[in-house]
Amino acid sequence: MEAFWESRAGHWAGGPAPGQFYRIPATPSGLMDPASAPCEGPITRTQNPMVTGTSVLGVKFDGGVVIAADMLGSYGSLARFRNISRIMRVNDSTMLGASGDYADFQYLKQVLGQMVIDEELLGDGHSYSPRAIHSWLTRAMYSRRSKMNPLWNTMVIGGYADGESFLGYVDMLGVAYEAPSLATGYGAYLAQPLLREVLEKQPVLSQTEARELVERCMRVLYYRDARSYNRFQIATVTEKGVEIEGPLSAQTNWDIAHMISGFE
């Protein structure tokens, strides 16, 4: 019997004390002692966007809002997907366009679509206003940013409700504001000055003037932004609802291209 207990003691030598867990010793194969393993960090799947979209433009006009975005999904610097939509109709009074990671935009489309369905199922005659969608996106983006797992998008929300045009901006950090004209991505440097130049001289535009202005800016972006593409959509929201047109293309002229040098 004593020999039995001695053999048992030898078998369990180095084992865990009562109430404790067994610690697996480190081996050359790379196994790590759980006690010394680093704590699990935040999820970082969206820290490296794969397919991205560039600028989104938005302008208020008398009786509505117009936004525009090209249809290119860039895989790094490769013009990989050339027929994707970056504009979403949320409901009859609201639309949005997104730049940044396309996968995150698809996720937001799914969430917003389900929110709208849930609201319609109540059958109370109410729907989300453009300002409500903008407010929700602000909280959603800030929440994800605070969890160190942001949705890598910058969005332009346009809408028309209660006789008022609405144009709002939300970025991946939850920064949000409203303005008569908006541009994301490279358009903030190239298109926004053109939009503001016109609005400073003529604060209230007609629908035709706003559309022509946006088309002009999309042409300039195609000339100057290497991640843009000459296939785009234009969405307009008025009291009649949301209308998305496209794919469209702008008339371009490259006759002076041979005169530009110094960028080889």
From Swiss-Prot:
<dbReference type="GO" id="GO:0005829">
    <property type="term" value="C:cytosol"/>
</dbReference>
<dbReference type="InterPro" id="IPR029055">
    <property type="entry name" value="Ntn_hydrolases_N"/>
</dbReference>
<dbReference type="GO" id="GO:0005654">
    <property type="term" value="C:nucleoplasm"/>
</dbReference>
<dbReference type="InterPro" id="IPR016050">
    <property type="entry name" value="Proteasome_bsu_CS"/>
</dbReference>
<dbReference type="InterPro" id="IPR001353">
    <property type="entry name" value="Proteasome_sua/b"/>
</dbReference>
<dbReference type="GO" id="GO:0036064">
    <property type="term" value="C:ciliary basal body"/>
</dbReference>
<comment type="subunit">
    <text>The 26S proteasome consists of a 20S proteasome core and two 19S regulatory subunits. The 20S proteasome core is a barrel-shaped complex made of 28 subunits that are arranged in four stacked rings. The two outer rings are each formed by seven alpha subunits, and the two inner rings are formed by seven beta subunits. The proteolytic activity is exerted by three beta-subunits PSMB5, PSMB6 and PSMB7. Forms a ternary complex with SMAD1 and OAZ1 before PSMB4 is incorporated into the 20S proteasome. Interacts with PRPF19.</text>
</comment>
<dbReference type="InterPro" id="IPR016295">
    <property type="entry name" value="Proteasome_beta4"/>
</dbReference>
<keyword id="KW-0539">Nucleus</keyword>
<dbReference type="GO" id="GO:0043161">
    <property type="term" value="P:proteasome-mediated ubiquitin-dependent protein catabolic process"/>
</dbReference>
<dbReference type="GO" id="GO:0005839">
    <property type="term" value="C:proteasome core complex"/>
</dbReference>
<feature type="modified residue" description="N-acetylmethionine">
    <location>
        <position position="1"/>
    </location>
</feature>
<dbReference type="GO" id="GO:0005739">
    <property type="term" value="C:mitochondrion"/>
</dbReference>
<comment type="similarity">
    <text>Belongs to the peptidase T1B family.</text>
</comment>
<feature type="propeptide">
    <location>
        <begin position="1"/>
        <end position="45"/>
    </location>
</feature>
<dbReference type="InterPro" id="IPR023333">
    <property type="entry name" value="Proteasome_suB-type"/>
</dbReference>
<feature type="modified residue" description="Phosphotyrosine">
    <location>
        <position position="102"/>
    </location>
</feature>
<keyword id="KW-0597">Phosphoprotein</keyword>
<keyword id="KW-0963">Cytoplasm</keyword>
<comment type="function">
    <text>Non-catalytic component of the 20S core proteasome complex involved in the proteolytic degradation of most intracellular proteins. This complex plays numerous essential roles within the cell by associating with different regulatory particles. Associated with two 19S regulatory particles, forms the 26S proteasome and thus participates in the ATP-dependent degradation of ubiquitinated proteins.</text>
</comment>
<protein>
    <recommendedName>
        <fullName>Proteasome subunit beta type-4</fullName>
    </recommendedName>
</protein>
<dbReference type="GO" id="GO:0001530">
    <property type="term" value="F:lipopolysaccharide binding"/>
</dbReference>
<dbReference type="Pfam" id="PF00227">
    <property type="entry name" value="Proteasome"/>
</dbReference>
<keyword id="KW-0007">Acetylation</keyword>
<dbReference type="GO" id="GO:0019774">
    <property type="term" value="C:proteasome core complex, beta-subunit complex"/>
</dbReference>
<keyword id="KW-0647">Proteasome</keyword>
<dbReference type="GO" id="GO:0002862">
    <property type="term" value="P:negative regulation of inflammatory response to antigenic stimulus"/>
</dbReference>
